[in-house]
Amino acid sequence: MSGGTPYIGSKISLISKAEIRYEGILYTIDTENSTVVLAKFALLGTEDRPTDRPIPPRDEVFEYIIFRGSDIKDLTVCEPPKPQCSLPQDPAIVQSSLGSSSTSFQSVSSYGPFSRMPTYSQFNQKSFRSTKFGRGRFRQLNKILRTFETTTSASLSQSSAVGSSFTSDARSLKTQLSQGRSSPHLDTLRKSPTMEQSVQTTPASHLPPPGPVGRRSPPPARPLPSVNQRTIESQEQKRVEAHRLSRPEADQLRNENKDANKRQAAPGAPPARRGRGGHRGGRGRFGIRRDGPMKFEKDFDFESANAQFTKEEIDREFHNKLKLKDDKPEKVEKPVNGEDKGDSGIDTQNSEGNADEEEALASNCYYDKTKSFFDNISCDDNRERRQTWAEERRINAETFGLPLRSNRGRGGYRGRGSGMGFRGARGRGGQRGGFGAPRGFRGGFRGTRGGREFADFEYRKDNKVAA
């Protein structure tokens, strides 16, 4: 076979440096990235070649695979490209698809993912002019692949994105062929190695210039019947009807849920099982305002709003809150033995001096140990502040109040404790059953001995309770 026969579209047997053989159709060769792409390939495994990791063959036929030129060990041309058959120019043909055995690889450079890949004509005129091949070794192509740049590698993300686009295009084309309708995306679907098999005819305004692949277009004088537009309109009408029917069905389900809740709340009905979170309800359209958005008659008057606030009064109130003076009424000195101390100059001088000192202390004192909260936890207190049970019980009662004693089940309240039990009952306070609120160790007893105060029990040295 002469060198003028194109290699693109030939069946290629490729062996990688891992001794794994792949067999598929040569789709294209990228000279910039030094990659080779095989379409419709099969994995034949390592076969009998010596390798550390033998791989068995697989029966699946994959869409495509990209090889780096530096990782290819050997190439063999198994079969030349098969001749292409074209359909007759019949205006009655709306859409057709060829079998999987017939593929076309001549318009390689027009594909989106491989826009930089050269066509066969570049290789045909330069390096393969004097090469003859049959089922023998493809030595010349192997030498060219080894002269490619080995520093660049194909990106895995790009290959995965290309593979997903091929499979999605194939699925969408199959659904369109089964429904018998066309789509404006059919021109883009043709630009993939697996979609080149299908031969479709559309109106002349959507067709690219005719090529040697075998696409035929009907004469422009005879327009095609508008079957596709009718099917699209009917589908849109069905969607609108389904949307209209969905709202009454949702209202009906909502009413049924309300009736079921009423039946459960009836006096003769058995009590419903109590859950943890209660009824969540459906995801209906609740809380929607039906009176429309709020409307205002006029703009907001900032001047009248600011006139209601007096800056001086606000500042005065703020400064009054910052002052921490003692508001005790002044003591009126009573006369002693019928004599008024105010008559003596010494007493008057001493009282004036004491008043000045008190005012100075009152203005500089911001913390009163006799009134402040939690003053007993100060670091200046060197005494041992280990609280007794009675002290902590009193503090809990003053802080949180007394709990209800008729609480049953796993009641009580969480927090610092329920005021019952040793050390404030940190955890699940109260009792876990029984007929009262026993006050025992760490949250109460689990038994049914209720109603007895903790003070009724005797303490022993080993912290055991005597009945």
From Swiss-Prot:
Gly residues compositional bias, start-end: 414-448
Chief place of localization: cytoplasm
Biased composition regions of type Polar residues, renumbered to the chain: 172-182, 194-204
Residue ranges annotated as motif FFD box: 365-381
Biased composition annotated in UniProt, kind: Pro residues: 206-223
GO biological processes: P-body assembly; regulation of translation; stress granule assembly
Keywords recorded for this protein, A-Z: Cytoplasm, Ribonucleoprotein
Boundaries of every Sm domain copy: 1-81
Domain DFDF: 288-324
Biased composition, class Basic and acidic residues, residue ranges: 233-262, 325-344
PANTHER family: PROTEIN LSM14 HOMOLOG A, SCD6 PROTEIN-RELATED
Protein's name according to its UniProt entry: Protein LSM14 homolog
Naturally occurring in which organism (per UniProt): Pleurodeles waltl
Gene that this polypeptide is encoded by: lsm14
